[in-house]
Amino acid sequence: MSSAIEALFEERRRFPPSPEFASQANATGELYEQAERDYAAFWAGWARKLEWSKPFTETLEWNEPFARWFGDGELNVAVNCLDRHVRCGKGEKIAYYFEGEPGDRRTLTYRELLEDVNRFANGLRKLGIGKGDRVAIYMPMIPELPVAMLACARIGAAHSVIFGGFSPESIVDRVNDASCVALITADFGWRRGNKVPLKRNCDIAMEQTPTIAHCIVARRVGDDVFMHETRDIWWSELVAGESTECEPEAMNAEALLFLLYTSGTTAKPKGIKHTAAGYLTQAAMTHELVFDLKAAHDIYWCTADIGWVTGHSYIVYGPLANGASSVLYEGTPDFPDKDRFWEIVERYGVTILYTAPTAIRTFMKWGTEYPAKHDLSSLRLLGTVGEPINPEAWIWYREWIGANTTPVVDTWWQTETGGIMIAPLPGVTTLLPGSATRPLPGIGVDIVNDRGESVPLGGGGYVVLTHPWPGMLRGIWGDDERYVQTYWSKVPHRYFAGDGARRDADGNYWFMGRIDDVMNVSGHRISTTEIESALVDHPRVAEAAACGKLDEMTGQAVYAFVSLKGGLGGTPEFADELRDHVASKLGKFTRPKYVTFTQELPKTRSGKIMRRLLRDIAEGRTLGDTTTLADSSIVHELAERAKAEVAQEE
């Protein structure tokens, strides 16, 4: 860490809640006051909304940096997501509207989901899998994925979901780190009309995973795959004849619910540990309040992949704990055409939509004719997740998807936090385009400088969390020392989030991206997010990414990669126009030295811009691992263009 990050961009537009929305909102301003008085008691109140087989009497045990929440209580997560809803007469309520990429559709009621989970849980027990085991899951976005997760939770096994876009090597790393005893997969998945060979990837991986005794395979596509005689079993055969009842395992509140690995592109992946009760409490509370969920009639859709934490918390555990009806979509936003998302919103009458800024910027680039084809009037609340959203994308989202009326909740959180940490409470919070606004009730946040001192309002710096929260990670699997070093060693007694932000005069948080997405230009520390927001503010720019390039004169120079609306190419004259535009918005020292135009920015399959690769391209370095890219051909083309751009400027 060096000096605090300079905050340059000021957004003045404000959207207070409408009286109509506020009058029916789940949240009230009193929640902040309750949490301020006693945050542990506040969280205990939310935990008591869950069903406990043994109620807790101890709320928080804090031995920094290790927390135990509700530690003497017992519950079962699957019971809280399924059984209790069926018991109270909601068994016929739809849990999931499933839409496959090829257009096949299924609905699953809470009763059907419970029966499927119980059959599969019984099948797992028959294989000898049970309490304390770890089970890897590598599946497409089909209903069998949440079924597998909940079946593990029912019998007390911890799941480790591996994103279906990862390579066999990534499967090996994750399976071996946790000594998983079983691997659950599918024959294939669908992606843009192509068959993704999931089972084949698992076969390659299992040559190097000695702890895997069983591989369970769901049929998604139906094509032939290799089946090992003693190891592999079809899902359908495993559950055939199994009972639709399964006794749930009573689990301690602090029992491991799942592992989720953060990306291992530069180091060994970190197995983030989340435990049953605290995680479920925060997932359910945040889902109810941040999305203003009315479970009786809302149709909720989080477009993430379950392979990422957003899918765990806001497709599976939060919505099911709250008895919500959700859309589960297998495919991409542009297959078979660029209006697929809006077709789905219209078909199911989606009322709450939660997606990523990258997707929104892509929709902007494609143009408004695609959402305009469909009736989106069912939507009443929009959310964003995954990275900071620039104000223009926020405004576009509200205007073209939300009919200029819906609240837009920009949410900040991490794999490590388990649930949303900073976000508006719709009906309470005045919304600011580009700001996640305030920490949620019960969450302690501060911004500090490089000496660990709190930065006054109006200043920028490093985001830290000031006290424990229920959904927090309980460590890194098998590596307590790495947990302490990564998150607790940089600022005394504070969780170091690794993100930069500024806090305005009203206490609202404006995120500026990861700290490694900060440039030092002539002694000024500038967030790449602010540069990108200024670029996207230009009416012809659809998407932009910025990074620093080493520079003899200024330490670092700003390098901008720009994608234009309508897929148009850029000219040297327009590059100069963009340089002037950024300088006028943020100051002359922020003027990009290099501007490279591209049809597409390199992104992971989850839609995040691969900034590490852009830094490599800018510096002319050998490109690192590209296996997580959605389209690796983009990178090599971009590297050639960048080489020419640098040669021209120098």
Task: Give each language-model segment a name.
Residues 122, 150, 154-237, 349, ...:
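Structural core segment of the AMP-binding/adenylate-forming
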Residues 139, 160-176, 188-198, 278, ...:
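ATP-dependent adenylate-forming carboxylate-activation enzymes
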Residues 162-187, 202, 334, 346, ...:
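AMP-binding/adenylate-forming catalytic core of the ANL superfamily
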Residues 317, 321-324, 351-355, 364-431, ...:
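Gly/Ser/Thr-rich phosphate-binding loop
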